[in-house]
Design a protein with these regions (language model features):
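Charge-rich, low-complexity N-terminal segments
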Residues: 2-3, 10-168
Length: 168
């Protein structure tokens, strides 16, 4: 019978004797895990909400919207209030606060405070959730270019949009 003449491999936290074959198999699995971690697509996300008023003027006269029936939404043509909920996800390139999410959230909130002056209520005119997301993306991509961004905007956390903007 042939004896295994392979010298033992000693490594901290592993069995005192590990055959070369087992050692190499384990090391390959460990390296594969590291490669998967390095290839992972990383992102952070933040949430915030703002009170706002908007309207959908077409809802007053468009027969597909002002139906007079159970599906009538003509009331949307008049200015109405919502709490707009935002969830913003942005790509990061490493695992140690590439973008610090508390600072990112504060910056996003300040965008609305600066654009609306001292008013606590956003005046959004005819803007849809999709339009709001597109405007927000324009600001984010200027400050943090070359990253994917995903933005969700909802009315009263009930209905809304989700838009994914690939790396630019």
């Amino acid at each position: 019978m042939l004896e295994d003449k392979t010298e033992p491999v000693f490594e901290q936290d592993y069995p005192a004797y590990e055959s070369y074959h087992n050692y190499m198999g384990r090391r390959m699995r460990e390296e594969d895990k590291k490669m998967q971690i390095n290839k992972a697509q990383r992102s952070i996300w933040v949430t915030f909400s703002k009170e706002g008023v908007h309207c959908y003027p077409a809802a007053l006269e468009d027969p597909k919207l002002a139906t007079g029936g159970w599906d009538d939404v003509s009331f949307l043509g008049h200015p109405h209030r919502h709490i707009f909920h935002f969830r913003v996800r942005i790509e990061v390139f490493h695992d140690d606060r590439d973008i610090e999410f508390i600072q990112f959230k504060r910056w996003l909130i300040r965008l609305y405070e600066q654009s609306e002056g001292s008013s606590e209520v956003l005046v959004l005119d005819h803007k849809s959730c999709e339009m709001i997301a597109d405007e927000l993306y324009a600001e984010i991509s200027t400050r943090h270019p070359g990253r994917f961004v995903e933005i969700e905007v909802s009315e009263d956390n009930e209905n809304g949009c989700n838009i994914f903007y690939p790396n630019s």
